[in-house]
Swiss-Prot record:
It is an enzyme of class 7 (translocase). It is a peripheral membrane protein. Residues 2-231 form the ABC transporter domain. Keywords: ATP-binding, Cell membrane, Membrane, Nucleotide-binding, Translocase, Transport. It comes from the Bacteria. The lineage of its organism: Bacteria, Bacillati, Mycoplasmatota, Mollicutes, Acholeplasmatales. The gene is ecfA. This is Energy-coupling factor transporter ATP-binding protein EcfA.
Amino acid sequence: MISIQNLTFYYGCNPILKDINLTIQNNSWVSIVGHNGSGKSTLAKILLGLLAFNKGQIVIDNIVLNEKNLPILRPKIGIVFQNPDYQFTGLTVREDIAFGLENYNVCREEIIAKVLKYAKMVKIDDLLDKNVNQLSGGQKQRVTIASILAMEPEIIIFDEATSFLDPQGALEVQKIIQTIKNKILITITHDLDFASKSDEIIVLYQGKLITQRPPKNLLQDPLFLQQYKLTPPLSLQLYYEILKDSTTKKIKNNQMLENLKDILWQYNLKK
C-alpha cells in the first residue's frame, strides 16, 4: 500500500504539489490525470526517490520514504517512461530484458526462464534475437515493460508510456498494461479513455489533488470534466451531446437516457 500524507513539493519558490493526501491499495490500478503542469510526473519522481519533497510523509509497504530507506524501496518500484528510445544501446531484445537481472546477480537459469516468461507475456517472444534498435516504437515500449516485469517490482509507474507511440502501438501497450495483475499500477496519462479502465482516477489540478474516485463516477460528470479541462472518452462525448440535445428539445425519457449511458459506458470498457 502507498500512503501519502500532506505532501508538498516546491521547485525553487514555486509550489508544484500542495498538501497531497491519498492512499493507493495493494493490487490496484490507479490513473493520475490532469493538464500539463498539474504535478503528475513530479509525483512519480518523488515516489521513485528522484526528488526530495519539502513537507509531508510517504509510506510504501510500511516503509517510510526517506534517504535512509531508498536502497530498500527502489527495487520495489519500476517505471516506464514516455520515450522508449532512451535506454537502448544496440542490445538484442533478449539481452535488454536480461540486463537488469544480471546486475542483481540472478542465476543464469532463472534469467533465461524470466526472459522467456515476460517476453511471452508482452508478445515479443518471436523478437528475442532481434536488435532493439530495429523495432517499432510500440515494440520497444513492450521490451521496456518486459524488462521491468522481469525485475518483479511491487509497484509499476507508467509515465505517459504511450504518448510517443502511434495509435496502434499505443493500443497494444495499453492492452498489455491491462493484463498485469497482483501489483500496484500507476498510469500517468492524458487519455481518459485509457484511464477509464483503471480502478480509480486521481485528478490533479494546479498541484492540488481534486478527487480520487472510480472512473464511472467521475467520467459521467461532464461539468466536473469541463471545470478541470479533461476530455471524456469519445463514447461518453456522444452521450453528452445526446443529453444536451434532449435537454434543448425537452425530452424527458430519463430511463432511455440512462440506458443509453450504460450501453456507451460498457462499450467504452470493452475497447
